[in-house]
């Protein structure tokens, strides 16, 4: 049976390869995603990554750390890419973006079954030029 560690590694590999069909095979049929930007279920999770890949043609996901605790796996990732397409209504800026995430999954039946994450979305939208950078003045 596939371990949580293997699933978390494969997650990054499939996204970097822009292979959302392979990514979808990692998700349990009853997948629950607690990410507020994604629609419910497997389809919603695939759609949010489709949006990233479409907006950043060189989108890649790098594994920073994985902690496997049996039925729970935690991954820290860095996503990088050049913002060349519209993302969540933000027009292309051609800026290099970098997003850091902490993803927590519940593993069931050898698949990713439930997901929570923390993202630096404020910084991402600042990098895209959607909102001004904050300064200490």
Identify the meaning behind each predicted range.
Residues 1-137:
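C-terminal and inter-domain tail/linker signature
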């Amino acid at each position: 049976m596939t371990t949580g560690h293997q699933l978390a590694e494969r997650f990054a590999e499939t996204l970097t390869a822009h292979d959302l069909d392979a990514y979808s095979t990692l998700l349990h049929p009853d997948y629950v995603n607690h990410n507020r930007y994604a629609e419910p279920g497997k389809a919603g999770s695939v759609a949010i990554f489709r949006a990233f890949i479409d907006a950043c043609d060189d989108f890649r996901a790098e594994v920073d750390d994985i902690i496997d605790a049996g039925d729970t796996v935690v991954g820290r990732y860095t996503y990088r890419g050049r913002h060349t397409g519209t993302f969540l209504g933000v027009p292309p800026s051609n800026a290099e973006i970098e997003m850091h995430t902490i993803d927590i999954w519940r593993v069931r039946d050898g698949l990713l079954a439930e997901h929570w994450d923390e993202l630096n979305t404020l910084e991402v939208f600042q990098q895209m030029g959607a909102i001004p950078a904050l300064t200490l003045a």
